């Protein structure tokens, strides 16, 4: 027998990003950023991806959008920073749709795409402390990279974040191989 409350939960689909999604994605980014108050400077919390950057990601097939009733509620934006690796540049879920597996499905879509594209790994940088950041990604098989493991491309990501005002001591760079191998077990 079905529970009435479970029948009211929204259904989510992960779709390829489209131009008509762009205005909603900035709203999602700002709403999700509010959860990081106290972890990031106010200036960073007000940043959003530019329309040009999102259009470029759409054209490259590197933007995944979670929709509910055809409305965007979250998104993942990946980049190809270096040969053989995708970098999860942005993951945001509107707080009204948090803790329902939307972020997990978006990360899964990026990792599935990377594996299907014969890429070796997915990397990302995130906050160390909030449970929906590094601990969340660790639960999905990502591991923290030590400083000596950072590639030149990942060092540039860290340097860019530092210039934006993010404290590198509060951040981690993480890695997940796309195949079960000793490199990411």
Regions found by a protein language model. Name each.
Residues 44, 48, 133, 156-157:
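Short Asp/Glu-rich motifs
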Residues 12, 16-22, 26-95, 107-113, ...:
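Acetyl-CoA-dependent GNAT
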Residues 124-133, 150-155:
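Conserved beta-strand-loop-alpha-helix junction that forms the acyl-donor binding cleft
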Residues 71, 94-108, 117, 128-134, ...:
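Conserved glycine-rich acetyl-CoA-binding loop
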Residues 114-126:
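Conserved GNAT acetyl-CoA-binding A-motif
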Residues 2-7, 125, 139, 143, ...:
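Terminal substrate-recognition subdomain of acyl/acetyltransferases
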Residues 89, 99-102, 128-129, 143-147, ...:
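Short, structured secondary-structure boundary patches
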